[in-house]
Amino acid sequence: MSQKIRIKLKSYDYSLVDKSAEKIVKTVKATGAIVSGPIPLPTHKRIFTVNRSTFVNKKSREQFELSSYKRLIDIYSSTAKTVDALMKLELPSGVEVEIKV
């Protein structure tokens, strides 16, 4: 095969992303491929501001924050064994995985 595989991990919980990235790197290194990463990408924060009351008190507001964490892993000189190991790998729910070949 010998092609570059790029894996992007995304989640709202940073510990899930880090554990998943560590699991992928350990699995790929066991098959003999070269791994670059996990590279942390910028954290995307969305802030929502809402009124505490439904009708009056405009000055009384509450803010909520939703952060998404991302990691990037590049795999070089992959073999069929590497791809099989990645297909069989079980990652926790709550982690979005995007793979580009």
UniProtKB/Swiss-Prot annotation:
Looking up InterPro entries in the UniProt record yields: Ribosomal_uS10 (IPR001848), Ribosomal_uS10_CS (IPR018268), Ribosomal_uS10_dom (IPR027486), Ribosomal_uS10_dom_sf (IPR036838)
Matching Gene3D superfamilies, A to Z? Ribosomal protein S10 domain
Q: What's a single GO BP term from this record?
A: translation
Can you tell which superkingdom this protein's organism belongs to? Bacteria
Keywords, in A-Z order: Ribonucleoprotein, Ribosomal protein
Q: Which GO terms describe its cellular component?
A: ribonucleoprotein complex; ribosome
Q: Name one GO molecular function term.
A: tRNA binding
Entries under HAMAP family matching the protein: Ribosomal_uS10
Q: Which family does it belong to?
A: Belongs to the universal ribosomal protein uS10 family.
**Described purpose of this protein according to its UniProt entry:** Involved in the binding of tRNA to the ribosomes.
The UniProt subunit note reads as follows: Part of the 30S ribosomal subunit.
What NCBIfam families does UniProt report for this protein, alphabetically?
Answer: PRK00596.1, rpsJ_bact
Instruction: Give the protein's recorded name.
Output: Small ribosomal subunit protein uS10
Q: Which organism is this entry from?
A: Parabacteroides distasonis (strain ATCC 8503 / DSM 20701 / CIP 104284 / JCM 5825 / NCTC 11152)
